[in-house]
Amino acid sequence: MKTFINKKVSLNKRITFRRRRRKPVQPGERIDYKNLRLLCRFVSKQAKILSRRVSRLTSKQQRTVARYIKSARVLAFMPFVNNET
């Protein structure tokens, strides 16, 4: 008695590779209220502070970024609202 083993390889099976995401704040980058290029990455078009889930920051980084965004707004480095739309 012979046993047949189906050795067909599924053509629909694909190997997927995940690309590593860059960290939102690089290790050498300094979070500061004067670093507007960094702070603007964590603000939406409506000038709202993005959530941790969207910005992929740690909770400590999120608190720091939020504090410095608020300081930059008070010192008039950043707008409170965006009236472009």
UniProtKB/Swiss-Prot annotation:
It is found in: Plastid, Chloroplast. Its main location: plastid. Pfam families: Ribosomal_S18. One of its GO terms (cellular component) is mitochondrial small ribosomal subunit. InterPro entries: Ribosomal_bS18, Ribosomal_bS18_sf. NCBIfam families: S18. This is Small ribosomal subunit protein bS18c. The gene is rps18.
